[in-house]
Protein backbone atom coordinates (compact mmCIF):
# COMPACT_ATOMS: atom_id res chain seq x y z
CA UNK A 1 0.00 0.00 0.00
CA UNK A 2 2.84 2.42 0.82
CA UNK A 3 4.30 1.95 -2.67
CA UNK A 4 0.91 2.71 -4.23
CA UNK A 5 0.44 5.85 -2.13
CA UNK A 6 3.96 7.00 -2.99
CA UNK A 7 3.17 6.54 -6.70
CA UNK A 8 0.00 8.60 -6.40
CA UNK A 9 1.91 11.37 -4.61
CA UNK A 10 4.40 11.41 -7.48
CA UNK A 11 1.63 11.61 -10.07
CA UNK A 12 0.18 14.66 -8.34
CA UNK A 13 3.23 16.75 -9.11
CA UNK A 14 2.27 16.58 -12.79
CA UNK A 15 -1.47 16.99 -12.37
CA UNK A 16 -3.10 20.36 -12.88
CA UNK A 17 -6.03 19.61 -10.64
CA UNK A 18 -4.02 19.94 -7.45
CA UNK A 19 -0.76 21.84 -7.47
CA UNK A 20 1.19 20.28 -4.66
CA UNK A 21 4.55 21.93 -4.15
CA UNK A 22 4.24 21.43 -0.42
CA UNK A 23 1.68 21.19 2.32
CA UNK A 24 0.81 19.82 5.69
CA UNK A 25 -1.24 17.19 7.42
CA UNK A 26 -2.63 17.71 10.91
CA UNK A 27 -4.48 14.98 12.82
CA UNK A 28 -6.78 15.58 15.77
CA UNK A 29 -8.52 12.98 17.88
CA UNK A 30 -9.56 14.45 21.19
CA UNK A 31 -8.04 17.64 19.78
CA UNK A 32 -4.38 18.40 20.11
CA UNK A 33 -4.68 21.02 17.46
CA UNK A 34 -2.65 23.59 15.67
CA UNK A 35 -4.09 27.82 14.81
CA UNK A 36 -2.86 32.73 13.03
CA UNK A 37 -0.59 35.68 13.78
CA UNK A 38 -1.93 39.17 14.24
CA UNK A 39 -1.10 39.83 10.60
CA UNK A 40 -3.05 36.93 9.21
CA UNK A 41 -5.96 36.86 11.63
CA UNK A 42 -8.22 39.65 10.42
CA UNK A 43 -11.74 40.20 11.72
CA UNK A 44 -14.63 40.21 9.24
CA UNK A 45 -14.76 44.02 9.33
CA UNK A 46 -11.49 44.19 7.35
CA UNK A 47 -11.36 40.88 5.56
CA UNK A 48 -14.46 38.95 4.46
CA UNK A 49 -15.02 36.16 6.93
CA UNK A 50 -14.21 32.70 5.73
CA UNK A 51 -17.50 31.67 4.16
CA UNK A 52 -16.83 28.30 2.67
CA UNK A 53 -19.91 27.78 0.47
CA UNK A 54 -20.50 24.09 0.87
CA UNK A 55 -21.75 22.36 -2.27
CA UNK A 56 -24.99 20.49 -1.98
CA UNK A 57 -24.33 16.86 -1.16
CA UNK A 58 -26.55 13.97 -0.24
CA UNK A 59 -25.59 13.64 3.41
CA UNK A 60 -25.80 10.27 5.11
CA UNK A 61 -28.65 9.71 7.52
CA UNK A 62 -27.72 11.01 10.94
CA UNK A 63 -27.46 8.67 13.88
CA UNK A 64 -26.71 8.85 17.56
CA UNK A 65 -23.23 10.32 17.90
CA UNK A 66 -23.31 11.81 14.40
CA UNK A 67 -21.16 14.92 13.93
CA UNK A 68 -20.95 17.59 11.27
CA UNK A 69 -17.66 18.31 9.46
CA UNK A 70 -16.77 21.89 8.56
CA UNK A 71 -14.04 23.88 6.81
CA UNK A 72 -13.34 27.60 6.49
CA UNK A 73 -10.74 29.28 4.26
CA UNK A 74 -9.86 32.98 4.55
CA UNK A 75 -7.24 34.63 2.32
CA UNK A 76 -5.51 37.94 3.06
CA UNK A 77 -3.41 39.66 0.36
CA UNK A 78 -3.65 43.22 1.73
CA UNK A 79 0.05 43.49 2.58
CA UNK A 80 1.13 43.12 -1.04
CA UNK A 81 3.10 46.05 -2.49
CA UNK A 82 4.20 47.23 -5.92
CA UNK A 83 7.88 47.37 -6.85
CA UNK A 84 9.88 50.60 -6.86
CA UNK A 85 13.41 51.51 -7.93
CA UNK A 86 14.47 51.06 -4.32
CA UNK A 87 12.50 47.99 -3.23
CA UNK A 88 11.17 44.80 -4.74
CA UNK A 89 7.47 44.28 -5.14
CA UNK A 90 5.83 41.49 -3.18
CA UNK A 91 2.57 39.62 -3.27
CA UNK A 92 2.06 38.34 0.26
CA UNK A 93 -0.47 35.61 0.92
CA UNK A 94 -1.74 34.63 4.33
CA UNK A 95 -4.38 31.92 4.19
CA UNK A 96 -6.10 30.84 7.39
CA UNK A 97 -7.66 27.38 7.52
CA UNK A 98 -10.01 26.09 10.19
CA UNK A 99 -11.56 22.62 10.32
CA UNK A 100 -13.99 21.34 12.93
CA UNK A 101 -16.33 18.59 13.87
CA UNK A 102 -19.39 19.84 15.72
CA UNK A 103 -22.53 18.26 17.14
CA UNK A 104 -26.09 19.34 16.43
CA UNK A 105 -26.05 21.58 19.51
CA UNK A 106 -23.16 23.56 18.06
CA UNK A 107 -20.61 22.17 20.49
CA UNK A 108 -17.16 21.81 18.92
CA UNK A 109 -15.85 18.25 19.25
CA UNK A 110 -12.48 18.63 17.51
CA UNK A 111 -10.61 21.47 15.84
CA UNK A 112 -7.61 22.03 13.57
CA UNK A 113 -6.25 25.40 12.47
CA UNK A 114 -3.37 26.10 10.12
CA UNK A 115 -2.08 28.92 7.94
CA UNK A 116 -0.37 29.09 4.55
CA UNK A 117 2.13 31.97 4.22
CA UNK A 118 3.58 32.58 0.76
CA UNK A 119 5.37 35.45 -0.98
CA UNK A 120 6.12 36.11 -4.65
CA UNK A 121 8.69 38.88 -5.24
CA UNK A 122 9.23 40.82 -8.47
CA UNK A 123 11.28 43.83 -9.58
CA UNK A 124 10.31 47.16 -11.14
CA UNK A 125 10.40 45.58 -14.58
CA UNK A 126 7.80 42.99 -13.65
CA UNK A 127 10.30 40.14 -13.50
CA UNK A 128 9.74 37.57 -10.76
CA UNK A 129 12.80 37.19 -8.54
CA UNK A 130 11.47 34.46 -6.22
CA UNK A 131 12.10 30.76 -6.70
CA UNK A 132 8.58 29.76 -7.64
CA UNK A 133 9.51 26.07 -7.54
CA UNK A 134 10.38 26.22 -3.84
CA UNK A 135 8.19 24.38 -1.34
CA UNK A 136 5.38 26.37 0.25
CA UNK A 137 5.09 25.08 3.81
CA UNK A 138 2.27 25.87 6.20
CA UNK A 139 3.05 27.42 9.57
CA UNK A 140 2.37 24.14 11.34
CA UNK A 141 4.71 22.41 8.95
CA UNK A 142 7.43 25.00 9.55
CA UNK A 143 7.29 24.36 13.28
CA UNK A 144 10.36 25.83 15.00
CA UNK A 145 11.62 27.16 11.66
CA UNK A 146 8.82 29.72 11.70
CA UNK A 147 11.03 31.54 14.20
CA UNK A 148 8.72 33.14 16.73
CA UNK A 149 10.81 31.84 19.61
CA UNK A 150 14.25 32.21 18.04
CA UNK A 151 13.70 35.66 16.54
CA UNK A 152 10.78 37.10 18.46
CA UNK A 153 11.34 35.76 21.96
CA UNK A 154 7.82 34.32 22.08
CA UNK A 155 6.81 32.02 24.93
CA UNK A 156 6.12 29.26 22.42
CA UNK A 157 6.25 28.67 18.68
CA UNK A 158 3.27 29.50 16.47
CA UNK A 159 2.11 25.91 16.09
CA UNK A 160 2.17 25.35 19.85
CA UNK A 161 0.23 28.53 20.56
CA UNK A 162 -2.50 27.82 18.05
CA UNK A 163 -2.72 24.23 19.25
CA UNK A 164 -3.60 25.66 22.65
CA UNK A 165 -6.34 27.79 21.08
CA UNK A 166 -7.78 24.86 19.15
CA UNK A 167 -7.75 22.71 22.28
CA UNK A 168 -9.48 25.52 24.16
CA UNK A 169 -12.29 25.59 21.57
CA UNK A 170 -13.20 21.94 22.10
CA UNK A 171 -16.29 21.44 24.24
CA UNK A 172 -17.54 24.97 23.60
CA UNK A 173 -20.05 26.63 21.30
CA UNK A 174 -18.94 29.63 19.26
CA UNK A 175 -20.67 31.98 21.70
CA UNK A 176 -18.89 30.36 24.63
CA UNK A 177 -15.62 30.66 22.76
CA UNK A 178 -16.22 34.36 22.10
CA UNK A 179 -17.13 35.03 25.72
CA UNK A 180 -14.36 33.00 27.35
CA UNK A 181 -10.64 33.56 27.74
CA UNK A 182 -10.23 35.58 24.53
CA UNK A 183 -10.91 39.31 24.57
CA UNK A 184 -12.53 39.88 21.18
CA UNK A 185 -11.79 43.62 21.40
CA UNK A 186 -8.03 43.33 21.83
CA UNK A 187 -7.87 39.96 20.09
CA UNK A 188 -5.61 38.55 22.80
CA UNK A 189 -6.06 36.07 25.63
CA UNK A 190 -7.33 37.84 28.74
CA UNK A 191 -4.70 38.64 31.36
CA UNK A 192 -4.60 35.99 34.05
CA UNK A 193 -6.64 33.48 32.06
CA UNK A 194 -5.47 29.92 31.61
CA UNK A 195 -5.11 30.51 27.88
CA UNK A 196 -2.82 33.51 28.39
CA UNK A 197 -0.13 31.22 29.79
CA UNK A 198 0.16 29.35 26.50
CA UNK A 199 -1.01 31.78 23.79
CA UNK A 200 0.14 35.41 23.54
CA UNK A 201 -0.42 35.99 19.80
CA UNK A 202 -3.45 37.70 18.26
CA UNK A 203 -6.29 35.17 18.47
CA UNK A 204 -9.53 36.85 17.40
CA UNK A 205 -9.05 35.98 13.74
CA UNK A 206 -8.88 32.32 14.64
CA UNK A 207 -12.14 32.60 16.53
CA UNK A 208 -13.79 34.05 13.42
CA UNK A 209 -12.33 31.22 11.33
CA UNK A 210 -13.65 28.63 13.77
CA UNK A 211 -17.06 30.32 13.70
CA UNK A 212 -17.13 30.14 9.90
CA UNK A 213 -16.14 26.47 9.94
CA UNK A 214 -18.92 25.71 12.43
CA UNK A 215 -21.45 27.60 10.31
CA UNK A 216 -20.35 25.69 7.21
CA UNK A 217 -20.38 22.28 8.87
CA UNK A 218 -22.64 19.57 7.49
CA UNK A 219 -23.40 15.94 8.13
CA UNK A 220 -21.07 13.94 5.89
CA UNK A 221 -20.77 10.77 7.95
CA UNK A 222 -18.49 11.67 10.87
CA UNK A 223 -19.22 10.08 14.25
CA UNK A 224 -18.16 10.85 17.79
CA UNK A 225 -14.63 9.59 18.40
CA UNK A 226 -13.46 9.92 14.79
CA UNK A 227 -10.11 11.61 14.14
CA UNK A 228 -10.19 14.97 12.35
CA UNK A 229 -7.51 15.55 9.69
CA UNK A 230 -6.63 18.67 7.69
CA UNK A 231 -4.25 18.29 4.74
CA UNK A 232 -3.02 20.74 2.11
CA UNK A 233 -0.88 20.78 -1.03
CA UNK A 234 0.41 24.24 -1.93
CA UNK A 235 2.56 25.96 -4.55
CA UNK A 236 3.23 29.16 -6.51
CA UNK A 237 4.68 27.56 -9.64
CA UNK A 238 1.85 28.95 -11.81
CA UNK A 239 3.26 32.47 -11.31
CA UNK A 240 4.80 34.26 -14.31
CA UNK A 241 6.78 37.45 -15.02
CA UNK A 242 5.16 40.33 -16.89
CA UNK A 243 5.86 40.81 -20.60
CA UNK A 244 4.82 43.33 -23.23
CA UNK A 245 2.09 40.88 -24.26
CA UNK A 246 0.84 39.62 -20.90
CA UNK A 247 0.49 40.86 -17.34
CA UNK A 248 2.64 39.34 -14.65
CA UNK A 249 0.96 36.87 -12.34
CA UNK A 250 1.52 35.79 -8.77
CA UNK A 251 -0.62 32.73 -8.09
CA UNK A 252 -0.93 30.68 -4.95
CA UNK A 253 -2.58 27.31 -5.50
CA UNK A 254 -3.73 25.60 -2.33
CA UNK A 255 -5.67 22.36 -2.36
CA UNK A 256 -7.36 21.41 0.88
CA UNK A 257 -8.99 18.30 2.29
CA UNK A 258 -10.63 17.92 5.65
CA UNK A 259 -11.66 14.40 6.58
CA UNK A 260 -12.49 12.24 9.54
CA UNK A 261 -11.37 8.66 9.95
CA UNK A 262 -11.70 5.68 12.22
CA UNK A 263 -9.68 2.46 12.10
CA UNK A 264 -8.11 3.52 8.81
CA UNK A 265 -11.45 4.17 7.10
CA UNK A 266 -12.58 7.60 5.88
CA UNK A 267 -15.83 8.51 7.61
CA UNK A 268 -16.36 11.96 6.09
CA UNK A 269 -14.56 14.13 3.54
CA UNK A 270 -14.70 17.66 2.16
CA UNK A 271 -12.38 19.03 -0.54
CA UNK A 272 -11.77 22.59 -1.72
CA UNK A 273 -9.18 24.46 -3.78
CA UNK A 274 -7.83 28.01 -3.82
CA UNK A 275 -6.35 29.88 -6.78
CA UNK A 276 -5.31 33.29 -5.43
CA UNK A 277 -4.19 35.44 -8.37
CA UNK A 278 -2.58 38.89 -8.28
CA UNK A 279 -1.49 40.65 -11.48
CA UNK A 280 1.26 43.23 -12.00
CA UNK A 281 2.60 45.05 -15.06
CA UNK A 282 6.02 45.54 -16.66
CA UNK A 283 6.79 48.37 -14.23
CA UNK A 284 6.16 46.12 -11.24
CA UNK A 285 2.91 47.88 -10.38
CA UNK A 286 0.17 45.68 -8.91
CA UNK A 287 -3.02 46.01 -10.96
CA UNK A 288 -5.30 43.71 -8.94
CA UNK A 289 -7.70 45.09 -6.34
CA UNK A 290 -6.12 43.84 -3.12
CA UNK A 291 -9.30 44.55 -1.17
CA UNK A 292 -11.46 42.26 -3.29
CA UNK A 293 -12.42 38.94 -1.66
CA UNK A 294 -10.45 35.89 -2.73
CA UNK A 295 -12.88 33.01 -3.12
CA UNK A 296 -12.23 29.29 -3.22
CA UNK A 297 -13.58 27.10 -6.01
CA UNK A 298 -16.42 25.92 -3.79
CA UNK A 299 -17.30 29.51 -2.95
CA UNK A 300 -17.26 30.45 -6.63
CA UNK A 301 -19.68 27.65 -7.46
CA UNK A 302 -21.22 28.25 -10.90
CA UNK A 303 -19.03 31.34 -11.36
CA UNK A 304 -16.01 29.07 -11.71
CA UNK A 305 -17.39 28.41 -15.19
CA UNK A 306 -16.67 24.76 -15.96
CA UNK A 307 -20.23 24.22 -17.16
CA UNK A 308 -20.81 27.58 -18.83
CA UNK A 309 -17.46 27.78 -20.60
CA UNK A 310 -16.20 24.23 -20.72
CA UNK A 311 -19.40 22.25 -21.21
CA UNK A 312 -18.64 20.06 -18.18
CA UNK A 313 -21.30 17.68 -16.87
CA UNK A 314 -21.16 19.45 -13.51
CA UNK A 315 -19.39 22.38 -11.87
CA UNK A 316 -16.08 21.90 -10.02
CA UNK A 317 -17.63 22.10 -6.56
CA UNK A 318 -20.19 19.43 -7.46
CA UNK A 319 -17.55 17.10 -8.91
CA UNK A 320 -15.27 17.56 -5.89
CA UNK A 321 -18.21 16.79 -3.60
CA UNK A 322 -19.03 13.68 -5.65
CA UNK A 323 -15.45 12.45 -5.30
CA UNK A 324 -15.47 13.14 -1.55
CA UNK A 325 -18.73 11.27 -1.16
CA UNK A 326 -17.43 8.37 -3.27
CA UNK A 327 -14.34 7.83 -1.10
CA UNK A 328 -16.22 7.99 2.20
CA UNK A 329 -16.16 4.49 3.66
CA UNK A 330 -12.90 3.64 1.88
CA UNK A 331 -9.32 3.16 3.08
CA UNK A 332 -6.22 4.93 1.76
CA UNK A 333 -5.45 1.85 -0.34
CA UNK A 334 -8.96 1.89 -1.80
CA UNK A 335 -8.60 5.53 -2.83
CA UNK A 336 -5.14 4.97 -4.29
CA UNK A 337 -6.53 2.03 -6.25
CA UNK A 338 -9.32 3.92 -8.00
CA UNK A 339 -8.98 3.19 -11.72
CA UNK A 340 -7.89 6.22 -13.73
CA UNK A 341 -6.93 7.05 -17.32
CA UNK A 342 -3.55 8.34 -18.51
CA UNK A 343 -4.78 11.85 -17.76
CA UNK A 344 -5.81 10.69 -14.25
CA UNK A 345 -9.53 10.99 -14.95
CA UNK A 346 -11.89 8.27 -13.65
CA UNK A 347 -11.76 5.22 -15.90
CA UNK A 348 -14.44 5.03 -18.58
CA UNK A 349 -17.45 3.04 -17.46
CA UNK A 350 -16.66 3.30 -13.76
CA UNK A 351 -19.30 4.43 -11.27
CA UNK A 352 -17.24 7.51 -10.46
CA UNK A 353 -17.01 8.55 -14.14
CA UNK A 354 -20.75 9.23 -14.23
CA UNK A 355 -20.38 12.17 -11.84
CA UNK A 356 -16.68 13.12 -12.04
CA UNK A 357 -14.93 13.90 -15.33
CA UNK A 358 -12.09 16.10 -14.06
CA UNK A 359 -8.64 14.71 -13.31
CA UNK A 360 -8.55 13.10 -9.87
CA UNK A 361 -4.88 12.13 -9.56
CA UNK A 362 -4.32 15.20 -7.44
CA UNK A 363 -7.32 14.36 -5.28
CA UNK A 364 -5.90 10.88 -4.74
CA UNK A 365 -2.54 12.36 -3.74
CA UNK A 366 -4.18 14.78 -1.32
CA UNK A 367 -6.14 12.00 0.35
CA UNK A 368 -3.04 9.78 0.47
CA UNK A 369 -1.25 12.58 2.32
CA UNK A 370 -4.14 13.05 4.73
CA UNK A 371 -4.26 9.34 5.50
CA UNK A 372 -0.52 8.93 6.17
Regions found by a protein language model. Give the residues of each.
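C-terminal motif of bacterial Sec signal peptides marking the signal peptidase cleavage site
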Residues: 16-20
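Positively charged n-region of N-terminal signal peptides that target proteins for export
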Residues: 1-11
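Bacterial signal peptide processing site
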Residues: 22-24
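N-terminal, intrinsically disordered, polar/charged segments of Gram-positive cell-envelope systems
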Residues: 26-64
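Generic cytosolic/nucleocytoplasmic N-terminal low-complexity/intrinsically disordered segments
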Residues: 1-2, 44, 138, 296
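Intrinsically disordered, low-complexity segments enriched in glycine/proline and serine/threonine
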Residues: 5-6, 41, 48, 55, ...
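Active-site- and interface-proximal helix/loop "cap" or "latch" segments in soluble metabolic
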Residues: 63-372
Amino acid sequence: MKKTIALILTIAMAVATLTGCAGTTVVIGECTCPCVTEDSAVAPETTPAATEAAPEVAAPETASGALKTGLAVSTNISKSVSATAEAAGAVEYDVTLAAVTVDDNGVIQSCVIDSIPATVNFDNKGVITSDITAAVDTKNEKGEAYGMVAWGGAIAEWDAQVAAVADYAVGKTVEELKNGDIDMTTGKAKDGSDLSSSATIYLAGYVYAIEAAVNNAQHLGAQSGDELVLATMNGVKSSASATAEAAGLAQLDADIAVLTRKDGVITSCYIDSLQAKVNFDVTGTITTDLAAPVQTKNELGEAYGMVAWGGAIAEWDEQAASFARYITGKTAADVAGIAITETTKPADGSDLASSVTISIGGFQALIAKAMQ
